[in-house]
Amino acid sequence: MLERTVCYGTCPAYRLRLSNRGEIRFDSHNPGDEGRRVTDTVAAATLPALISRAKTVGFFDLPSEIAADSVLCHNRATDHPTVIVTVFARAQTKRVEDYHGCFETVEHETLPAITRLRAFEVEVDSALGSSRWVRPANRR
C-alpha cells in the first residue's frame, strides 16, 4: 500500500492498494475529491516484484518514521507531503512513514537510504499506473 498526504500546495493525496491477485484500488483523498475510487488490475507478478524491490532498496531496514530519526532527518522543512508505504510480505509487515520535508542538509540533499526509498515510492506509483487517476489537489 502507498498513501500520499496533502501538503501546503497542490500535492495530490491518495491511497493505492495492491492485492496478491493484482487488484489495484485507488482512493482519492484530495479535498473536494474525497471518496473517488477507481479499480483496475495488473499482472499478479507485480506484487512479488515490488516486494523483491523493497528488499533490494533496504525498505525493511528503515525506521517506521523517517522524521523521528535524527540521522535520516537531520534538517526538516515545512509544508511537504508525507508518503506512507506498507509492505505485507509473507514473513513480515513493514510500514514506513516518509515525511518529504526531511533532508540531510539545508540544501535539501538526502542520504542514500532516503533517495532509494523515494525512488521506490515512485516505482510503486509507476507499476500501478497511478498517474491515470491522480489529480492535483486544490491549492491550500
Model regions: which residues?
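A short-motif feature that recognizes glycine-rich, charge-decorated loops
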Residues: 25-64
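A mature extracytoplasmic/lumenal domain signature
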Residues: 20-22, 30, 54, 89-91, ...
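A short, structured loop/turn motif at beta-sheet edges
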Residues: 18-21, 41-49, 86-94
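N-terminal secretory signal peptides
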Residues: 1-34
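Residue-level detector of beta-strand structural context in well-folded domains
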Residues: 14-16, 38, 83
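Short, well-ordered, aromatic-rich surface patches in folded extracellular/luminal domains
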Residues: 1-8, 57-140
